[in-house]
């Protein structure tokens, strides 16, 4: 990590430019685009391999071409749009529409990356790379939700206009030329309208693969500002003390976790503030992408007040119309909610305890709250239907588009999907739903092979034998079986710290 900081501070001269709050000259540094093409930073904890984001490493960066493109961009007149405008047609347009945003996003990420590294080192968090894992959220929920009463399911609204994003960035980036360049680029980008007006899909997948790095940075900045309502409420709520508050910024998917928010009693000089701020209880907040949850031990009335705060703050501060229906408040003991591909809830498990005192014995009926993580079988089957592995009834069908591949390739593809789904849903408290998904994939694989060889499923299974079955067994299943007994393995929740993204078949929106 010291090496990473040395690269950021020395190689990019970040200290000098950060003091001057002037980032625009960095766009004319050729090494910026080398770093944007996975020549330095992408090996750190903040980034994913560039092949996952569609970058073309064969595209050579030239500072002279970049300067020419920036000059042309500034000379364009956005009041008149011509269909025959060919100034950015062909290879130059491809270079312009991808390279400049890559460099701009890389420059904008530098201060956040340095700030995150210093924050983690200051907090002395060991193995903080494990915090990138999506599964790191669930132990937190497992430890806290079973003691809470109400949960609020929130969808963060999207910006309705690009100027809102630019105004948001202006509060943190005071470099006018850089913001002007960003505004020009956003006016040019043909996918921007679909980015900010899409209502059919609220997940982050609406971003185009082209320039995904820049759009993810803008989206993260927008969400970060939307969450600033928590800071606003902290100031309004007197001594609202944050025990642990860390923001994890990543280029792909990132989430902010505020572990505890505690309100302590106010002093006499603050009695003029509203009465209902006096005893606001513990509030927990977790977010992934555009969906977040807030849970608390407070009453339904206080949860409605938090909902009122959020809706009005977003509307007044960001001019975002957030429908109240996007924030659902439910009682945890009677409601389950979808989050990160799991159906989460709190279940009351009855227990009978026998107590004996001297010669008298007592039978005490009690109930223990248990945090449930269930694999949502119907949404998963719906994903399999869209991928054409089964029909709407869950009956396995052949994957016809894979029938031209070799037998080993077909088996490997199905096995890879099955292992990834099993790996991600290893934290499920009930594994029988996952067994059904495995059965659908295994039989779909057999039907695909049978279609290729114009044979029957029984003949294929008899010919391949154990080879077909072994491909669908996860490697960690064999390792974990040595730790837990077979009877406990079906009920034990196992969270892995190497999962940094959700599989495409997992319904998480």
Swiss-Prot record:
It is found in: Plastid, Chloroplast. It holds the Pfam family MatK_N. The keyword RNA-binding applies. It comes from the Eukaryota. GO terms for molecular function: RNA binding. One of its GO terms (cellular component) is chloroplast. InterPro entries: Domain_X, Maturase_MatK, Maturase_MatK_N. Keywords: Chloroplast, mRNA processing, Plastid, RNA-binding, tRNA processing. One of its GO terms (biological process) is tRNA processing. Belongs to the intron maturase 2 family. MatK subfamily. Usually encoded in the trnK tRNA gene intron. Probably assists in splicing its own and other chloroplast group II introns. This is Maturase K. It comes from Nymphaea odorata. The lineage of its organism: Eukaryota, Viridiplantae, Streptophyta, Embryophyta, Tracheophyta.
